[in-house]
Amino acid sequence: MSKKPKEFESNKIMEQILKRSKGKTIDLVVDHELYGVTPEMIDWWWDNIDTSERYKLWHPEDHKSFEWEVSPKKGHVGAIQRIVENIGLPTLLRIRWEDPKSSPIPIEYSHALVGSTLDQDDEPMTWLLHEYEPIESGTKLRTTFRLPARVPKPFIEALRKHNIKEISEFAIFLPNLYEQNKNSV
């Protein structure tokens, strides 16, 4: 695999938006309640997506492909996913899992996964935070996307809808997948 993936037009557009935003950002926050899904299942998921087939379980319509550019074998901080998904248009993303202590987004829940989407120079363009904690019926999860301030509103709405669908899928597939695979890691 080449070190630098081919860019889709959406990557170039995001880099232009980032420059025009001049360091200003906005946050998109989406809250979820997941019945029958535990924080431990979600913790397991992040390091065990592993294949495009498994990645597509998370959003059968929009997720197209997945591979580790840098695997999480030694812990997920520093791991890089290379994914293709459809958020209004085909989007190639390189997401690097970051140390939660370096999160520019305040963390409020007991479990947190922090990621940055990388530009062609491996610098963060956007940030995301999945944070979650147990509730009586399962897990409450909050996703926060920190985006350049000049991101078009239609993209923000498409991202919100994508996130709602993707996180809601956890309740459908994750309990069984976790139960079948939790000891094989």
Q: Which residues are covered by each model-predicted region?
A:
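Hydrophobic ligand-binding cavity/cleft-lining segments
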Residues: 1-74
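Hydrophobic/aromatic beta-strand elements that line small-molecule binding cavities or substrate pockets
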Residues: 30-32, 94-101, 125-134
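A compositional/structural signature for long, glycine/proline-rich flexible linkers
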Residues: 32, 39-41, 75-78, 86, ...
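Glycine-rich portal/gate segments that line the openings of hydrophobic small-molecule binding cavities
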Residues: 60-119
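Beta-strand/loop substructures that line and gate deep hydrophobic ligand-binding cavities in soluble
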Residues: 110-168
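Short, highly charged C-terminal tails/helix-capping segments
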Residues: 174-185
